[in-house]
Structure formats: C-alpha cells, structure tokens
Amino acid sequence: ELLATRVWVGVSAGSMVTGPDLLLRTSQIVYGEDLNRSEEMQALGLVDFYVLPHLNSQFFEKVRKEYIDEAVKVTDKTLYALDDQSAIAVLDGKREVVSEGVWHVWNEK
C-alpha cells in the first residue's frame, strides 16, 4: 500500500531484499559468502525481479559479468546487475534503468 505513495530506495542489500526471494545460490557464488543455507529465504516481494548490486566493485571480485553468467542459471526470473552508479526506477509496473555506469540484465521479460 505504501509503495503507491512513497519512494523505496534500496542500496546494496536493501535493493536485494525487494525481489521475490534472496536468490541465495546465486548470491553465495558472486558475493563469496557462505550463509550455511541452501534453501531460499523469502524477500519483500515488492518487485518480480532480482538485483545484484556492486557490479565491478573492487570490494567484490566475483560480481562480474562472467561469474554472474554462470550463477544466474538457477533462475528464469529477470536479474539486473548494477554498478554503484546505476539504479532501477519502477513506476506503474514499468522498469527503467537509470545509469551513468555499467549494468547488465539477464532473462529479461
């Protein structure tokens, strides 16, 4: 209800929790964190796609297109990888990437 009259700004993991679930298998591969879990965890479900932030960041060596190309094979949902100069605006169900940097999309529908 609130999203109809408010703006959600998700930064870093705050953008990841907006999707249908946390896409743990992919996240564990590209972020290199072993969360000691294999089952999915529900996210907020505000959008029907996934976001992987920090594309090409010096702090996350596997958040690169070549790693994500492999890791994304576990889902058929749309996934965006965004660098720190990129964002996704969603208005009336329409997505628009706003970027002065680099971003990629997989399984675009």
Q: What are these model-predicted stretches?
A:
Residues 22-109:
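C-terminal and late-domain segments of enzyme folds
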Residues 2-21:
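Catalytic nucleophile loop
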